[in-house]
Amino acid sequence: MRLKAGKLRMWIQMFEHINNPQRVLPTLKRKNENGHRVYYDEDKNRYHSVTTVVGTIDQKGLDEWREKVGKDVADYVAIRSGITGTKLHKIVESYLANEKSEEENIFAKAHFNNIEPLLANIDLINGLETKLCSKRLGLAGTVDCIAQYKGVDSIIDFKTSSKKKKDEWIKKYFLQTTAYSIMWEELTGIKVTQIVILITGEDGSREEYIRNRDDYVEELEEVIAKYTEQ
């Protein structure tokens, strides 16, 4: 069964947020340098984009796919997926912030309606679309959600897909959220080891992955080292 857009379901305020006045996160500015996304903090420290770094682990497969389907098709799919993903994130952010969304993109609305049942597992939200960085890792990025998921403090990321994923296809998502977990701990002193990936597929699939970040720290460090050696 494929996704159907329909109308965005109306919602009322239901998510509780945690306000911590002692928590001060750095101000990060994003730039593009030589085709690569980087971040700078207030002290001019430079950080690689976590998305860019972990994306290198499946670059070979992506290049092979682009060659197979052709540049025009690959560019179209990438652009459409990027737009849909961005708009879905805005809808989800509004929803979790107890605000109404006016988004009209039919693909994003369909994905939201598909993933909404999983969002009911979220509570006690500590941050939405929060910019983080780690001097230890040399990485920075924006985490979708920091909250409890099924009663456990978690780093949560939302993803769109054309179809149901296999575990081996989404290793970079686990590495990405592991990086966010380390960043959050470094900046706040709060250790959050549960990482959660929620994926909505165009084929109507809805996937929930719950992992422990400690299972991915070593591999993340290896990927970072390989990237910085280039």
Which sequence ranges carry the predicted segments?
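Mg2+/Mn2+-dependent nuclease catalytic core
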Residues: T130-E229
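Metal-dependent nuclease catalytic cores that hydrolyze phosphodiester bonds in DNA/RNA
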Residues: L3-A140
